[in-house]
C-alpha cells in the first residue's frame, strides 16, 4: 500500500532477510510476541541481527494473541505500533506470523494517522490485507486512542 508519499508492506513472517534490504525497505516492524515458540514459525530472535547489517531499521511492538489482550491493552499496543508505522523511515514492512496482527496494526495506523473511520479501516484490512481473527477485527472496530 502507498500513501502519504510512503510505501508500506503488510505480510507474514519473512522467510529470508536479504531480499528485504535488496528491495530497498528501510524499516521493519515486527508485531509478534517474542514468547511465540510454535514451530515451524517460531519468533525469530535473529531477525534484527540479519536486518541491521543491511541498513534496515528493526523494532518489535508485540500484539500477542495468547493470552488474548483486553481492548485497553490492544489500544495501547496497536497505537504504539501505529506510531512506528507513521514515524519510521519508509518503505516500511510490518509483519507477524501470518499477517493477521500486522493487518490489525496497519488498520489502527489508518485510523490514527490517516483519518479512516474504524469500520472502513477494518474492512480494508480484511479485504485487502490479511485480517481474519474475529477478536482483532472487533478490537480494530472498537479502537480508541489510549
Residue ranges of each PLM-predicted region?
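Cys-dependent protein tyrosine phosphatase-like superfamily
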Residues: 1-93, 104-146
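Short cysteine clusters
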Residues: 96
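Substrate/cofactor-recognition hotspot
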Residues: 99
